[in-house]
UniProtKB/Swiss-Prot annotation:
A zinc finger (FPG-type) spans 229-263. Its EC number is 3.2.2.-, 4.2.99.18. It holds the Pfam family zf-FPG_IleRS. It comes from the Bacteria. GO terms for biological process: base-excision repair. This is Endonuclease 8. HAMAP family: Endonuclease_8 (MF_01253). It catalyses: 2'-deoxyribonucleotide-(2'-deoxyribose 5'-phosphate)-2'-deoxyribonucleotide-DNA = a 3'-end 2'-deoxyribonucleotide-(2,3-dehydro-2,3-deoxyribose 5'-phosphate)-DNA + a 5'-end 5'-phospho-2'-deoxyribonucleoside-DNA + H(+). Keywords: DNA damage, DNA repair, DNA-binding, Glycosidase, Hydrolase, Lyase, Metal-binding, Multifunctional enzyme, Zinc, Zinc-finger. Involved in base excision repair of DNA damaged by oxidation or by mutagenic agents. Acts as a DNA glycosylase that recognizes and removes damaged bases. Has a preference for oxidized pyrimidines, such as thymine glycol, 5,6-dihydrouracil and 5,6-dihydrothymine. Has AP (apurinic/apyrimidinic) lyase activity and introduces nicks in the DNA strand. Cleaves the DNA backbone by beta-delta elimination to generate a single-strand break at the site of the removed base with both 3'- and 5'-phosphates. It comes from Salmonella paratyphi B (strain ATCC BAA-1250 / SPB7).
Amino acid sequence: MPEGPEIRRAADNLEAAIKGKPLTDVWFAFAQLKPYESQLTGQLVTRIETRGKALLTHFSNGLTLYSHNQLYGVWRVIDTGEIPQTTRILRVRLQTADKTILLYSASDIEMLTAEQLTTHPFLQRVGPDVLDARLTPEEVKARLLSPRFCNRQFSGLLLDQAFLAGLGNYLRVEILWQVGLTGQHKAKDLNEAQLNALSHALLDIPRLSYTTRGQADENKHHGALFRFKVFHRDGEACERCGGIIEKTTLSSRPFYWCPHCQK
């Protein structure tokens, strides 16, 4: 499943295609959304927001399209009039004069009013987004030390969208390597220096992945993501200590780590 940086970059691409342009045609696959087709035609997409792995497409009439890609959903941008060659099932089409955005295969799609946004179950449950520039390391540290999260092992906590939205497995792996910790640790057992390092890494690593994606610099990884330090590098030497990176399973997900410098 894509993690926060990939979801945000997808939202950027969608915004670049249709933001601020009148919608010339709107189509939904689901019957409960059909009444909104006429309501949205002629409206503008004002912004596309991410909340972890969910997308919120805001329209000029105050409505918001909520979509969660889950495992199989994918958004695509095409030239208006183009007919994509795909076996995926189309769920949403938002068309402007020159560009059209398409959502395939997703099933978690709703139209929400401003009031419903404040009470939506997923949006109520999800924590602050790691790519939200307003979120600070101090606020992350406070969440780590809160009664709700301080006694949970990082192996599970860093996959929990209620803690911080947008984290996922590769980010969990890279963050814990960056701070030299294993997944069995809990925030309540860390010293001040470790807490500060982790609070910064929980924001710095996702933001680095987002900002360097596809750029030709030392953090590039196969043109897709920043260069991984340990993820999918089992059997290779750790660049920090020279130890051999190992692979195991934590919280039912593959976990990569260096036993020599992650304690």
